[in-house]
């Protein structure tokens, strides 16, 4: 007889190798065929809702690792909620307006000037929808489940109509106005930018000290005195109309070569050193407030510069600030208070205009040099140097931006700022610092410039009467919203103003019935920031406010910000109950991923080489709330973790062959204690994993599941129970007990890991015996039982045993290293435990089996101490059983089986 044929070895068709790049698309096709998303919604109909609202990615190009991180995090949340008692629909969205699409078309050779705006916009829309289709397939390949047949897209007519109504509501409440103010202006994009569209990069700039000679000193200063300013924007000197000082600072006159130079008193030594004025002396000291309304002479032009008090002035540089109301927010504010004009001698392209005599036609950066020369010739340039500093850049073109006063449309938040700050307190922020970050942004935030001088976007629904009066009324807004809903926003460019107005519309400022329409479009952040109105409030399966917004940390100044502004403005409430933010994905060395450096990794690469499951498991394994590093080495390490999890699942499934959980199950009370321990540990795991999911702590989910597979199962339970599973009779009570625990474990383990590893969980689900549900995602997670005192005591007892077992394993490892034994079954242990450990071991059955040795004897003392126990490892007595490999002195008691131990003899004879 071949005794190996009598062993009940593991048997399953669940493959050891995942072959994920090939097998995942098959699973996704299966989900598609069975309409899994719809089936999940039907399963959860009538349950409480949990709405995660998708922040729309920009529809341009392949998805990058930031998208991968973001979408997987969202999918984990939605899949978990859908398996844990909630109806959690997921409607993916796309942001489709804005400059990058215009630029992409122009790069593709589209000649904008050869067509109408409406025709160009049609091409933009076509391109955007192609990008949506492209990205949709990549998101689906990640395993992200959602309503892809009915996404929300910001160019959809119904979305644009809702956006117009939201704008109209804000206008009706007086929050929208037109004004000429300095805004971030991108010469490279030829458009205004919002703060959310700015990123800071290092830039080398000219830094100059300039002297402004006093014209009218008000009997305080002399005509030989000069105010000394320092600036890194020489090109703004032609726009100078004033000088700001602080009423809180004292100023001193530096006397040098017969002239006086006014700077903040505390900065005198610094300025003297910077200018190299050896021998300069310090004269009279003044209060800054005394300088108000003194007049200085502009260093280049025949006009005055008014000295003003500014609360923005600090004891830095010289303590005297060059003020150009057309080129700075504080400059504008102070200038308005003192009645100064708003001079802005720079055009849309960043070129100096005729209002800057001597520099007309120069690009502003090129003008820096010429202005420096002119100042030197005028005797006003005290020093020129160059500095490297952090400077605002256009986030799309990566080119520097300027502050430039232009007529723009603004959304004012001052009337509801307090409500916003109150609402921020009501939201759950993960991480908690998000609350402080957004609070500080709104506390100090100025008005939001919402107009853009571009073609591809939602037009501002504003008309102008014959005398220039702005027309925004509930009637016109309602009519435009209806037109957009029916025809899309391109109708604005296809029809004349009069044809866009309600029939028979009149206005006293247009006696001849002539109207013009606004040519600016809305900031794209107004588009996505309207999604709570255009999606949450309009789609029947969704609700406002959403339970969760989950995006990258850059969205504190982006989508979290614009959504909160528009929602509080129109509803008085935040659009979200909770906000979770994640960091950026960096390369393996902690550098920003950049095509120019060549250090980018695309999700599609990871999926082709390793599979989406590996990318998803990586997402769960990192501290996503901070910046995370991604390299091929990271993914190789995660692949190894995945292999261990998969092998654990395979072992569990492989030992359930012929097990019927309805008839073979052993009741909990009848399980041997070691099996009760593992079953109780499983219950404890359910509680811990669900708590981690609820706290959005996916790294803890990963660690709990991985450690349970590797430490609790593979290294302990699955290791010692092989002796039961393979050796005992098929229906032996001990074997059925282990199978009962294994069945519950594999079902629970697959359910707990399903939100993170959906392909693997659903693949394995098909091989769980007796399962009738078509997909694991149509099941619900088990409830986490409350841990009883008895259960906790059981876990504590067996945890103590596992500490003892670790000590035994150390002793066995040393014996193996000394060639005393090979496999542990070749060993006999002499144990000399202390009283506490002795008492513990006295209550534990089948100690040899648990420790996987052939014999154990308790002795008074042993060779070496390990923890609480003296342990001697000897060669086992007797001979090796051919079937179970245990050493026994009782081999061959049955002459028919001379090489078998009594246990194996009994099993074989029963077959």
UniProtKB/Swiss-Prot annotation:
Residue span of motif 'HIGH' region: 57-67
Enzyme Commission (EC) number: 6.1.1.5
Enzyme class: ligase
Name of the protein: Isoleucine--tRNA ligase
Organismal lineage: Bacteria, Bacillati, Bacillota, Bacilli, Bacillales
Chief localization: cytoplasm
Binding residues annotated for Zn(2+), in chain numbering: 881, 884, 901, 904
Residues that bind L-isoleucyl-5'-AMP: 551
Cellular location(s): Cytoplasm
Function text: Catalyzes the attachment of isoleucine to tRNA(Ile). As IleRS can inadvertently accommodate and process structurally similar amino acids such as valine, to avoid such errors it has two additional distinct tRNA(Ile)-dependent editing activities. One activity is designated as 'pretransfer' editing and involves the hydrolysis of activated Val-AMP. The other activity is designated 'posttransfer' editing and involves deacylation of mischarged Val-tRNA(Ile).
